[in-house]
Amino acid sequence: MEAQVLTERASFQMTAHYLRFMPVEIKNKKASYTYFLTDEFTAGLVLSGSEIKSIRAGKASITESYCRFENGEVWVLNMYVAEYPNAGYMPQDPRRKRKLLLQKTEIKKLNKKVKDVGVTLVPTLLFVAPSGYAKLKFSVAKGKKLHDKREAIKNRDVSRDLSKI
């Protein structure tokens, strides 16, 4: 009897552990439609405890966010992370700027690429790594014109029609 209770507790602890690190992927579907994406980078995020809990629950959005350089550091702005209901009495701004964790060589490389006119850094994917930390994939992007977007839609429709045949 006692052994059965111990195995039930162990299995519950294992499932709780796996639920804590379930794969969470929050995508920016607008990015590939609005921009030409070239180079992709991955960086960690500086977050508070309640913010990482909201991200693990899938309550975040990166559709309208962008990255900017300030004082030799890269920051992501306008990224929405919902307030965690059990966070306590300290309210957090859901759209505050968050620092990206990058090495100095990566920051210099990105800064050179972004100096061109019309080039920016756009977040494409927010995910929780197997280590439990939140990571942000972002790309060097150049804006598309309206005729480029229409051409992309036509190509997508043609490929869909060909796959049906």
Predicted regions and their residues:
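N-terminal amphipathic/basic-hydrophobic helices that include classical n-h-c signal peptides
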Residues: 1-21
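Generic detector of short, well-ordered, non-transmembrane alpha-helical segments enriched
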Residues: 18, 48-49, 132
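Short, charged/polar low-complexity linear motifs in solvent-exposed/disordered segments
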Residues: 15, 72, 80, 93-95, ...
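Alpha-helix boundary/capping detector
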Residues: 78, 137-140, 162
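Flexible glycine-rich active-site/ligand-binding loops centered on an Asp-His dyad
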Residues: 81, 149-165
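Beta-rich strand-turn-strand
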Residues: 103-139, 143-145
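Short small-residue beta-strand/loop micro-motif enriched in glycine and branched aliphatics
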Residues: 88-90, 145-148
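Ribosome large-subunit tunnel/peptidyl-transferase-proximal elements
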Residues: 23-119
